[in-house]
Amino acid sequence: MQFGRAIAALAGIACALPVVIATPLERRFFGSHEEPRDVKWDTNHFTVAAGLCQATYCPSTKVGSKVGDDAKLLWYKGDGDDVQRALIFHSKTLGITVALEGTNTSSMVSTANDVFAVPVDVDYRFKDSVPKGAQLMFGFQDAYLKVADDVAKMVPKFKKEYNESRLTITGHSLGAAMGLVAAGHLQKVIHGGVHEVILFGLPRAGNKIYADWFDKTFGDRFHFIVNGHDWVPHVAPRILGYRQVSNQIWINPANSTNWKFYPGQENVHGCDSVVPEWGSFDDHQGVYFHTQIGASLGHCPATIGQD
């Protein structure tokens, strides 16, 4: 596991070099200057989503098991090695929820998804839904495509079984990047589309064309949460054309209850305003809305709102 963590950290640092050498003026040029605001949404949604993200890191989570008093696991696919885990829950708070696993740093295959930073066209499954020129990072899209068809098949089944109209997508780290891809795909192929998208520790996963389309499509149905000085949301680098989406919620200091909403893409007052802790996973695997998420630091069995 330490080797995998080292590879992931080195890859992140390599991707970050263009960010590190950029001047403060260059960094400010890219982003929104809107002032931070109070978080007006029901933060219990974020707390529950964090618990379901944590469950993806727990191989012992079996069909029928519960996460807190809120959610029951209905289906899963993936071994966390060749295929990232994709879990489908029925949640009282979030409805039918797809939770996607973050990087398994003991797996070279899983870690490789974070390294293949080549931008590629959006997959044929939903390419005609996005503007021409929209691109995603190869490793993130490829990781999702290994579970995409099965997820798209099972979601309607469970929506019907539970008489549920809501579909929520969540994920942490690599799982968050996969969630950004999944939202685009499932918005097209699932009747009623996606109700809510909540992502934690989200890397830059697409280019500006994709980010603009995503913002327009999902609006306030989407939020991503950054914890403290986490470096992951600062990669892949903008010099390769990647752009962070809007609707950042930044927890600062890390693991605290001090959170604010930062409108617009790459908001200069948000996490871009501090120097990330390159190579450290402490904030990345931190406490998000009273729930810790992380392969090594989070709880198994997963809990909701206990931190």
Mark where each language-model region is:
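Residue-level signal for mature regions of secreted extracellular proteins and peptides
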Residues: 9, 15, 46, 51, ...
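A residue-level signal for conserved active-site and pocket-lining positions in enzyme catalytic cores
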Residues: 52, 98, 147, 197, ...
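Fungal secretory targeting signals
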Residues: 1-26
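Conserved beta-strand elements of beta-rich interaction domains across eukaryotes
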Residues: 15, 93-94, 103-105, 174, ...
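Lipolytic serine-hydrolase domain surface
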Residues: 211-307
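Serine-dependent carboxylesterase/thioesterase catalytic core
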Residues: 152-242
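Flexible, membrane-associating and regulatory peripheral segments of lipid-active enzymes
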Residues: 21-106
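A conserved cap/lid and substrate-binding interface adjacent to the catalytic center
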Residues: 70-169, 189-194, 216-220, 307
